[in-house]
A protein has these predicted regions:
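C-terminal subregions of glycosyltransferases and related glycan-biosynthesis enzymes
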Residues: 153, 157-169, 177-178, 184-355
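Nucleotide-sugar donor-binding/catalytic module of glycosyltransferases
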Residues: 1-233
Length: 355
């Protein structure tokens, strides 16, 4: 079996309605040297039949069905392990969903970025969010931008990636297999994509193509309780009741300070312990920034709501105006100034969005 340069792993589960469009867009890529491995996790709808029809029509498509359900975490891991085992000479790997849409030049563009610079370990495009019917959201935020090319210090890249990444978009980019294999894909924690990308940042840079080449059928953020159910079919481990960022810091400590997994990067166990502390530090700063931003927003909304007609009528009384001017306004101003300073300090550190 000739090995393609690119392998794509797609974990499938009960998305028969959107899967045909997803497969059509993947198989319409202008860059054609790839294999697509579809892994069904025991779907109860027509998902498997859709996948098998695609395999019958295109020799690049391969289909398998898990003997038992693995859940989202296990099936995503298998979506890396199986394609790279089937095609061990593959240089690049991508994770594909069973419900999104890819522009025909998506793969061509990302392969070009990785080919141009061996220091890049992940390439991804700008993302457009679409609804269940494929329509772009009218009130969607502008595409998230993050590119770490030019950042040469591994620890600085890790901190930068944590603050600025849009993990839910970037995880569907194109990875350099050698770098991803060294990290080991998803660890058994909640929000594993953020941890994976933080670890991967130690091994190289992230490059973003400056055009929208992927449409994400946005289904809302995955609540942590739902993640526990989808990831751990036999019951969530006790440590998943900890905040996800503490789980990540613990995983960093175990991997790099105890097991010495950073040896290939010249990161000893003592430096690995510092990495775990770095991760914990940037996590706490990020949470502080988000909390300060929320509090500032509430203060501004409360202030604006307070300027309604009843308050304006009260302010027509000179004595009320005097009290408000001397006592209320200075107190509100001091609170807003403090929150504004916290937000500004965090933004100078590069705090990002949790998309």
């Amino acid at each position: 079996m000739t090995s393609p340069r690119v392998v794509i792993g797609a974990p499938l589960y009960n998305k028969a309605g959107h899967l045909p469009e997803a497969l059509d867009s993947l198989l319409a890529q202008t860059y054609r040297d790839f294999a697509l491995v579809l892994i069904d996790d025991g779907s109860t709808d027509a998902t498997l039949a859709v996948a098998e029809r695609a395999a019958a029509a295109d020799p690049r498509v391969h289909v398998t069905r898990n003997e038992r359900r693995l859940g989202m975490l296990g099936n995503t891991r298998r979506a890396f392990d199986l394609p790279t085992t089937m095609f061990p000479a593959a240089e690049y790997w991508a994770l594909a969903s069973d419900h999104d849409v890819w522009h025909p030049r998506w793969l061509e563009t990302l392969v070009g970025l990785l080919d141009a610079d061996p220091g890049i370990v992940l390439a991804y495009p700008l993302t457009r969010r679409i609804d269940e019917h494929g329509r772009p959201y009218a009130n969607a935020k502008p595409p998230w931008r993050f590119d770490s090319r030019g950042c040469t210090d591994p620890r600085a890249r890790m901190r930068l990636a944590f603050r600025r990444m849009a993990a839910g978009d970037m995880i569907y980019g194109l990875f350099r297999v050698s770098a991803l294999a060294a990290v080991g894909t998803y660890r058994p924690v909640l929000v594993p994509d953020r941890l994976l990308l933080s670890e991967l940042a130690l091994r190289g840079t992230f490059a973003q193509a400056d055009e929208v080449l992927w449409e994400r059928r946005f289904r809302g953020l995955a609540e942590l309780e739902r993640q526990k159910q989808a990831f751990f079919l036999d019951g969530a481990p006790a440590y998943t009741h900890l905040p996800w960022w503490l789980q990540h810091a613990g995983a960093f400590a175990w991997a790099y300070a105890v097991r010495g997994e950073g040896a290939s990067l010249g990161i000893g166990r003592r430096a690995g312990a510092r990495l775990a502390l770095d991760y914990l530090d940037v996590s706490l700063r990020h949470r502080l920034w988000r909390r300060a931003r929320r509090l500032r927003g509430r203060a501004i909304r409360a202030r604006d709501a307070a300027l309604g007609p009843p308050v304006r009528a009260a302010l027509a009384v000179p004595a009320v105006r005097t009290v408000v001017r001397r006592r209320v306004v200075p107190a509100l101003g001091a609170a807003e100034e403090t929150l504004g300073r916290l937000v500004a300090e965090a933004e100078r550190e590069g705090a990002g969005d949790d998309r």
